[in-house]
Amino acid sequence: MRRWRIEDSAELYNINGWGLKYFSINDKGHVAVTPREGNASVDLKELMDELQVRDVTSPVLVRFPDILDNRIEKISKCFEQAAEEYGYTAQNFIIYPIKVNQMRPVVEEIIGHGKKFNLGLEAGSKPELHAVIAVNTDSDSLIICNGYKDESYIELALLAQKMGKRIFL
């Protein structure tokens, strides 16, 4: 039987299928994350080992806000380049569908970093709209209402509009 190689880890984790430039296999064969290009990588196995030493038990949720920030910047830059190439001059907005990840720290990071990129939020249901109204404190930010709109959903959207939110039904 042959020795385990780094390539075996890359294949096992299918790192090339989903890791982009953020996740890789390091020289120890461990999954590593580089949240921001040019910055240091974090060995996730070593991180978990260190957490165990500190009596932190798994499962552990590890967030990488720099990856979120970088993806927002990338989307904005790509659209900017395409707009320039095709002579598109209208204002544009990046819209984050809250159903992708509704966790407050994630949404707050996206809103906070996305402010300078005209980032708005999309709600496809009344519970999502409640969440969006609660976290979206910037009156300039868009709120897009998608999905089935019953009377109470429309009433909530109109109430949010009266509160100064920029709502699109």
Regions found by a protein language model. Give the residues of each.
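Active-site-proximal beta-alpha core segment in soluble small-molecule metabolic enzymes
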Residues: 87-169
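Low-complexity, highly charged intrinsically disordered N-terminal segments
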Residues: 25-39, 44-102
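A general structural signal for short secondary-structure junctions and capping/turn motifs
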Residues: 12-15, 21-24, 49-52, 134-136, ...
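Short acidic/polar alpha-helix capping motifs at helix-coil junctions
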Residues: 12-14, 70, 143
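A short linear-motif detector with a strong N-terminal bias
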Residues: 1-4, 10-12, 40, 73-75, ...
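Residue-level detector of functional hotspots within protein domains
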Residues: 8-11, 17, 80, 84-86, ...
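Generic serine detector
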Residues: 9, 24, 41, 58, ...
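N-terminal basic/disordered segments at the start of proteins
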Residues: 1-40
